[in-house]
């Protein structure tokens, strides 16, 4: 088997050109951050350059370097007039060197060497057993795919044709010889598997044709003077060999259908071909090839002589001339395999120009808009279908026909019974009340601290008059009082929502309780007698409803596919390519969503027809329903609603519990902020009072505040310390402007409280301290609402 020699190269340094480009186009910080990646790139190229072994490890190393070059090609304009990096490479045939300032030339050369290593692995594989033949075949087909991809790539970058092995004829010849040898492996495996002579004949005929084509390409003007002469010899020998094998196998099949004259004619041609194969064998030909040719010379010659003798003495069948024989059908099974996926950690993935990021963001907006539109369409049609069924009393009216408790209701009852429905909701309500009380207590404690501090400050100011010259509390606590008012408001809303949930539970408590008693429900359900002649209508209606369920389930599956596609859809690398207009890229890439969109549109149209068919069948069905059936249906609907409310209550209470737990963390932090502030103010109060009573002038520049006055809360992030006593009023005013504590909003929960007052047992809303004058929230702040007690859809 033939393999391809690798191209050779010299050492190349990426460091200076790439570092300079990154620094100029991005920043020095970016260039510093990529020093390691560039050094690794240099090292990887050296490893690839010095490869000697033909192993899977070598193959993977070359592929890794080729993959990284794909990133360089997109991000660095490596050319003679821009980022100047010269790449010297010899051609595979004569080892003549070409040097180009082209990343395309470098990438094409590395891909060539990848194909070369693959071909060498294939040709060196032991094919004495089936597994070896299969491995060699797979590698030859992969090599064909590599050289085919290289032919396409080189055609897009004409500068690559500087190297003789990158000409169109050269690369086509390499694809052909790889396919020829892969087809040869397929023939060998078929022979090992003892397949029919007819199949073997067709496979061998295709091998011969591939070698003929390869020979013709080698004799083209651009290749005949530079390729190894042994390639022509091998191609000629194998072309004759497999023509002979094809004729030989076909002739054996003719004996089975008593076409003895044609059999002799084909065997005579086979003898000529196998002799030509032997004549063209070079002395340097591999021993394995010589043995194969010699073996077939003997087999075909003997079989031909035996067939001629039998025909002359027994059959006397006319031997047709060669030109009247029908050509043997060829069976090409070898095919060029696609290249492996480029799957690597891109060392330069952060080097994306801002303009490309904007273009990528624009496309992301397009796909997100498309996704939202389709998801909204799915939701609309699903809800529309459910509403249509509900308006027709379905599926309740069908379930009402079951004897005893319908399966769907039994399942609901089992859920409620296993969860101890009423007890479960009662426990959750008690738990949420406890959490609400705890949150309220924390918030009230914080408010009391602030009020107490302000009252004491006002008392000191009234007692000492002008001597009590420090910043008033209300000035420093503006943000704290604002947060207190905001948190108090949230607790008020939350208690209203809790009240609504409790009332909802009380309204449906009995029905939920009954769901835990199957015997009682069975006793309540009247029997439903339907004329036997209407069983067909029921069956038809059930089938249509099942079809509708399947349709909606399929839409949900399509929705998931859309989400996954949208999540993985990143076209940044494609936008980096200068070869294509971005508007064309947008148009092409968004098309990948069209098949799923078409499936959805077909589903929506099908739903319209299904709903109409269900409506017609339901009209036939409802005309025959009995009075008992209607009563039964009403009872079943009642318990279906009770189960729905039970699930809503669980969801509301779980969400409320999470809200109170998260809110408690925020309130505790707020309480600590208030404690820090009031502690610092208390220390200041004590020291200032001591100085006044000692007769020390607090404004004297000689007076140094005690350590306790050194901003006792400065170590905390909000810095609620007041100004020092020895500062002037102007200095105090400047310091006051720094005391702007940052607000910490509560967690993000959707909440829509009901418009009525909570009962007294919930503790009622917490009023802010009377002396506070909480300012309204700043315009940039939008307080997130707490949880919504009625925001679930079932």
From Swiss-Prot:
Biased composition (Pro residues): 765-787
One Pfam family matching this protein: ALIX_LYPXL_bnd
Any one GO CC term of the record: cytoplasm
Feature: compositional bias, Polar residues: 713-722
InterPro entries: ALIX_V_dom, BRO1_dom, BRO1_sf
Coiled coil keyword on record: yes
Disruption phenotype: No obvious effect on unicellular growth but induces a premature development arrest, with an inability to differentiate spores and to build a true stalk indicative of a major defect in differentiation and morphogenesis. The abortive structure contains a mixture of undifferentiated cells and vacuolated stalk-like cells. Differing results include abnormal development only at very low extracellular Ca(2+) conditions (below 10 nM) or at alkaline pH (pH 9).
Gene3D superfamilies: alix/aip1 in complex with the ypdl late domain, alix/aip1 like domains
CDD domains: BRO1_Alix_like_1 (cd09246)
SMART domains according to UniProt: BRO1
Annotated region described as Disordered, given as residue ranges: 695-794
Keyword tags: Coiled coil, Cytoplasm, Cytoplasmic vesicle, Endosome, Membrane
Compositional bias segments (type: Low complexity): 698-712, 723-742, 749-764
PROSITE patterns: BRO1
Localization (cell): Cytoplasm; Cytoplasmic vesicle membrane; Endosome
Main location: cytoplasm
Coiled-coil residue windows: 499-568, 600-655
Domain BRO1, residue spans: 1-385
GO terms (BP aspect): anatomical structure morphogenesis; calcium-mediated signaling; negative regulation of sorocarp stalk cell differentiation; positive regulation of sporulation resulting in formation of a cellular spore; protein transport to vacuole involved in ubiquitin-dependent protein catabolic process via the multivesicular body sorting pathway
Function, as annotated: Unknown. Required for development but not for cell death.
Subunit record text: Self-associates; the interaction is calcium-independent Interacts with pefa; the interaction is calcium-dependent. Interacts with pefb; the interaction is calcium-dependent.
Name this polypeptide is given: ALG-2 interacting protein X
Annotated organism of origin: Dictyostelium discoideum
